[in-house]
């Protein structure tokens, strides 16, 4: 029994070192050995009661420490905002960050049940086939013809600088419909999942009607088209599309297209405070996000819009699970918990969970405009601020206090964007690039070591698609993925935009809506420097 006691004392001296280091597994092995030794001694009747009590108490303390540490790791989001000091960030901006990106609506923190992980086999040959088909142009398929102006605009759809506003103008305010159809065609989703073209067009048009229902300045069909294109860019240029199955790519594009369907132009908190029907329906939990998914799926109950009619039962269920998780993850109040969970996953030896990674991609795309060119970013910011101010007007009419950034007379636009970039956008895109590196680098290394690639991989590496003007699209094989360039480009653009906001903040935060000269000057400056 002495050896057991000695080992216990030694373990006590190293417990906390192991808990915070990389030798946690070793600690558990030693603790397991002690407990098994005690069991054997109990069986033999050779037990020292004092040592037995000491070891059991110690085992309990270790388990309790681990439980507390794990609970704190999963639930504590306060530290994510701990570096927002009152003397460096205006109180209004700090309140907005806290109220928007954390769940602090008077609800008790409660450990959420771990969602079942969605696991599927990565079909390499299948992936190779769909990538080879991506750039097969089908501009004049039955049911949808592309106007010449739309064809010209969509030539830039693979670029980060893609101008969705130009597409919306070229398409007669149907940017979402053409973006959905374009990507479903490029990824060969129509053929692969036997999607009736008439259903796809009817569904896309119904989505546009829903996005236009409340005439929102920001959360409208243009935003949906922008997020969908951004998701496409991320999948394409990080190589993530090589990691995903065709069903998962369908889920990504579909979720992006519907993620803000029938958005009311007001926040979840506004719905909760006004006790709206949708807040009552969803019990104040991710109110709008639940509605977006539910309403979009309700459309597909109509036969003429049922784009998923030919999916197998398993595929339909798997896709729905993915779409629900992705869209609910766009609830900004879960931002810090989502970031923390992914960051913790990166520290684990096993691979990243597909559904959670896909959710991160959609979330990043949803808040990506500060990482776009100043011309686009500034335009999106002005639209979002006007939407906030319209909510503030409603709050004033109802006698409610102004939500953060919703008072058009006092809101500091530049400061809010600086805070948004510092505490939300930069960490999100940093995590996105770290995640894609962990996923894709092993795939690139494996691909380069394969002397005789599979049929699909071989066809994928040589894939080039012919465009309308007879030229070739770029090579988007695994070998062509340049994660360093992807990361550096984002960092540079975000930094440039932040500096521009700092310049505006230094000018004294003029009201961008009352001072039209400022807005016009900014847009002219953006045009000359874009």
Curated annotation (Swiss-Prot):
Keywords annotated in UniProt: Calmodulin-binding, cAMP, cGMP, Hydrolase, Magnesium, Metal-binding, Zinc
Top-level taxon: Eukaryota
Example of a GO cellular component annotation carried by this entry: neuronal cell body
Record: residues binding Zn(2+): 223, 259-260, 366
Species for this entry: Bos taurus
Organism phylogeny: Eukaryota, Metazoa, Chordata, Craniata, Vertebrata
UniProt-listed InterPro entries: HD/PDEase_dom, PDEase, PDEase_catalytic_dom, PDEase_catalytic_dom_sf, PDEase_CS, PDEase_N
Residue ranges, compositional bias (Basic and acidic residues): 510-530
Annotated Polar residues bias: 451-471
Cofactor note: Binds 2 divalent metal cations per subunit. Site 1 may preferentially bind zinc ions.
Alphabetical GO biological process terms: cAMP-mediated signaling
EC number(s) stated in the UniProt entry for this protein: 3.1.4.17
Function: Calcium/calmodulin-dependent cyclic nucleotide phosphodiesterase with a dual specificity for the second messengers cGMP and cAMP, which are key regulators of many important physiological processes. Has a higher efficiency with cGMP compared to cAMP.
Region spans: Disordered: 450-471, 502-530
Keyword Zinc-finger: no
Protein name: Dual specificity calcium/calmodulin-dependent 3',5'-cyclic nucleotide phosphodiesterase 1A
Annotated segments matching region Calmodulin-binding: 24-44, 114-137
Catalytic center residues: 219 (proton donor)
Subunit structure: Homodimer. Interacts with YWHAZ.
Alphabetical list of PANTHER family matching this protein: CYCLIC NUCLEOTIDE PHOSPHODIESTERASE
Residues the entry annotates as binding Mg(2+): 260
Family statement drawn from the similarity comment of this UniProt entry: Belongs to the cyclic nucleotide phosphodiesterase family. PDE1 subfamily.
Residue ranges annotated for the PDEase domain, each copy included: 142-508
Keyword hit for Magnesium: yes
CDD domains in the record: HDc (cd00077)
PROSITE patterns: PDEASE_I_1, PDEASE_I_2
């Amino acid at each position: 029994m002495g050896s057991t006691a000695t080992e216990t004392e030694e373990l006590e001296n190293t417990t906390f070192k192991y808990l915070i280091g990389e030798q946690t597994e070793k600690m558990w092995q030693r603790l397991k050995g002690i407990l098994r030794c005690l069991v054997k001694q109990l069986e033999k009747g050779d037990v020292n009661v004092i040592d037995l009590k000491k070891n059991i108490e110690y085992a309990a303390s270790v388990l309790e420490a681990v439980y507390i540490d794990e609970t704190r790791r999963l639930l504590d989001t306060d530290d994510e905002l701990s570096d927002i000091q009152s003397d460096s960030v205006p109180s209004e901006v700090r309140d907005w960050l806290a109220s928007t990106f954390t769940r602090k609506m008077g609800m008790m923190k409660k450990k959420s049940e771990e969602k079942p992980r969605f696991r599927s086999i990565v079909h390499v040959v299948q992936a190779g086939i769909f990538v080879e088909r991506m750039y097969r142009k089908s501009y004049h398929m039955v049911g949808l013809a592309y106007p010449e102006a739309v064809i010209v605009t969509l030539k830039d759809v693979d670029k980060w600088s893609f101008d969705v506003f130009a597409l919306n103008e070229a398409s007669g305010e149907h940017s979402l419909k053409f973006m959905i159809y374009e990507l479903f065609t490029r990824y060969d989703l129509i053929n692969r999942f036997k999607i009736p073209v008439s259903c796809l067009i009817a569904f896309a048009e119904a989505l546009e009607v829903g996005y236009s229902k409340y005439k929102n300045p920001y959360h409208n069909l243009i935003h949906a088209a922008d997020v969908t294109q951004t998701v496409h860019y991320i999948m394409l240029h990080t190589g993530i599309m090589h990691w995903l199955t065709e069903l998962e790519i369908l889920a990504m594009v579909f979720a992006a297209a519907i993620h803000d369907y029938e958005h009311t132009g007001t926040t979840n908190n506004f719905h909760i405070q006004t006790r709206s029907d949708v807040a009552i329906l969803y019990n104040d939990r991710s109110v709008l996000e639940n509605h977006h998914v539910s309403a979009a799926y309700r459309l597909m109950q109509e036969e003429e819009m049922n784009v998923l009619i030919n999916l197998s039962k398993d595929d339909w269920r798997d896709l729905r699970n993915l779409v629900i998780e992705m869209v609910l993850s766009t609830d900004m109040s879960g931002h810090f918990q989502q970031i923390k969970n992914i960051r913790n996953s990166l520290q684990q030896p096993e691979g990243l969970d597909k559904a959670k990674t896909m959710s991160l991609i959609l979330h990043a795309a949803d808040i990506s405009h500060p990482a776009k060119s100043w011309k686009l970013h500034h335009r999106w910011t002005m639209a979002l601020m006007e939407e906030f101010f319209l909510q503030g007007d409603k709050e004033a009419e109802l006698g409610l206090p102004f939500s953060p950034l919703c008072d058009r007379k006092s809101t500091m636009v530049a400061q809010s964007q600086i805070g948004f970039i510092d505490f939300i956008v930069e960490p999100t895109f940093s995590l996105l690039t770290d995640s894609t590196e962990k996923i894709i680098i092993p795939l690139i290394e494996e691909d380069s070591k394969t002397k005789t690639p599979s049929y699909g991989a071989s066809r994928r590496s040589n894939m080039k698609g012919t465009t309308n003007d007879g030229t070739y699209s770029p090579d988007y094989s695994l070998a062509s993925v340049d994660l360093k360039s992807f990361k550096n480009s984002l960092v540079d653009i975000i930094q440039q935009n932040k500096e521009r906001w700092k310049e505006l903040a230094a000018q004294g935060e003029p009201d961008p809506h009352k001072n039209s000269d400022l807005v016009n000057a900014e847009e002219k400056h953006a045009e000359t420097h874009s």
